Amino acid sequence: MSDIITVTLPDGSQKQTARGTTIADFVRESIGPGLAKAALFARVNGQDMDLARKLDEDVKLQIFTPKSPESLELIRHDAAHVVASAVQKLFPGTQVTIGPATEEGFYYDFFREKPFTPEDLEKIEAEANAELKRDMAFVRTEISMDEAVRLFEEKGEKFKVEIVKDIAAKGAKTLTLYTHGDWVDFCLGPHAPSTGKIGIIKILSSSGAYWRGDHRNPMLQRVYGTAFFDKKQLAEYLTRIEESKKRDHRKLGKELDLFHFHPYSPGSAFWTPKGTTLYTTLSNWMRQLTQNDGYVEIKTPLMFNKGLWETSGHWGKYKENMFLVLDSESGEHDFSLKPMNCPSHHLFYGFKKHSYRDLPLRYHTQDVLHRNEAAGSLGGLTRVRQFAQDDAHIYCTEAQITDEVRRFVKLLDHVYKAVGLTYAVKLSTRPEQRLGDDSLWDRAEGGLKAALESLGLEYELAPGDGAFYGPKIDFAVSDSIGRRWQLGTMQLDYLAPERFDLTYVGEDNAEHRPVVLHRAIFGSFERFTAILIEHFAGAFPAWLAPIQAVLVTVADRQNDYARKVRDSLRAKGYRVEFDERGLSMNAKIREAQLQKVPFTLVVGDNEVSGEGVSPRRYGGEDLKTMKVTDFEALLAKEAALP
């Protein structure tokens, strides 16, 4: 074995170094001191690692610095460790549980008798930032599972002991520890070289959370926080958070009278007339788009016997997330409300024999689904128990994958652009544990790549993140204030056709397995509606607005004319109201602005005599007085489904 290994860098260049050289030393000696000083972690053959790890074989190496988008997640994980250390220093006897990084920060769950007060959170933040100034190294070690159990038992960390034993029960032989100062926790890593690499930590809030999300378990204290490389980034984030609070769909949903919730049916929305209009407009829009794109809409039952879920594999893995129904004949909970559409669509496909000439078959549905989400996880429309998806399943041949993916991405692109959402694409490829041989995965991944590249789309490659039954493409959108939301997906599935014995007759008159493509654009209607409420801050474009125009008269003598205009516009399908309340004109205009109605139509004597209206856009832009027919033409253009 040679003592020299080859390191391939992202630009394709190659460098040699001694076997056993640490990543940090390699960067400093072979690339330069500037990058070595800025480096936070590395990706080695697709696996993220600390800079202190050694290079023992030929590798592909990528270095991440504060300029890398991926680095924020790293320092937020670091910050979770630092905050946990600060809490245990300030509040002896507090036990630690878990503390992951999240999309925009991190949280850590603690067990203690008393909830944290606002004053406690201020102390925690101050101590955490003091630990950053001490610039303590993160040191990685590995110990046996027995040693890990003893370590955390000696520390009195019963929750950590429980987790370690669970990990050991799954076959793990060793556990990775990270220490900074005298505080230690276990995690997979990686971590930055030291606490000083974190610029600043901000504690945001605290709340209660049950251990492992189960109300039968102890209540924990969850501390939320975030971290950035400098104060400017933090200030921008806090400004965005304040704007987010103003746009919170739960707040706007109440102010704009769109939806309600009731404890008798947690996680299930009551849609008001205005909210129902918003919901059905999205529903009808998606229905029109899919029909125009060659989909057929189907409906399948709400409730199924467990046999379906045993065939699909969900009964053993997903049963706890289902609402189970008692079978009066067997006396057992053998039925459930469906939590997803896929298995029932596979049954539907199997009702008939199919030829290669029938494919691709594109089934679309908007059926209601139910998932037994933990009560503590429910939040407005973004996490619910009853919902509907713009769900579709495409049954096609392997040769049709690229064209079908391309077709789907074009539809998704149209939808997101129509509502002003930009998006990023991630392609997740084969995991270690997977179905099928490498040639199958080569073809599947190649088909997805070819589709994305033919459309000129940039995408992030996520090696190993695909499902065991096939690779997938995920689409994360960014809203008007820069927040990212995971929405669309396209997943290839080679397993379902096997489980459900799905076939088609090929040109050779032999039976073949189709490929199943699972895809969604909205995700759930409820969550997509929440995102749009916040994205538009409740000020929807005319085509989506529950009320597109409201008429306001200067005096009562114009009321008959206003009713005539309202009725005329309604007859043509527009959503128009006339505010007949006994308020002043200015009060009515102000109310229309508060309700974010796209057009307020002022009617006075001049408008009556001229058969016109004086439109005012939401936000205050006055348009010139125009004939009703001219306004109708304007509204027709802006109210048309995109």
From Swiss-Prot:
PROSITE patterns: AA_TRNA_LIGASE_II, TGS. Keywords: Aminoacyl-tRNA synthetase, ATP-binding, Cytoplasm, Ligase, Metal-binding, Nucleotide-binding, Protein biosynthesis, RNA-binding, tRNA-binding, Zinc. Its cofactor is Zn(2+). It comes from the Bacteria. Residues 248-541 are annotated as: Catalytic. Zn(2+) binds at C342, H393, H518. It is found in: Cytoplasm. Gene3D superfamilies: 3.10.20.30, 3.30.54.20, Anticodon-binding domain, Bira Bifunctional Protein, Domain 2, Threonyl-trna Synthetase, Chain A, domain 2. Residues 1-65 form the TGS domain. Binds 1 zinc ion per subunit. This is Threonine--tRNA ligase. It comes from Myxococcus xanthus (strain DK1622). The lineage of its organism: Bacteria, Pseudomonadati, Myxococcota, Myxococcia, Myxococcales.
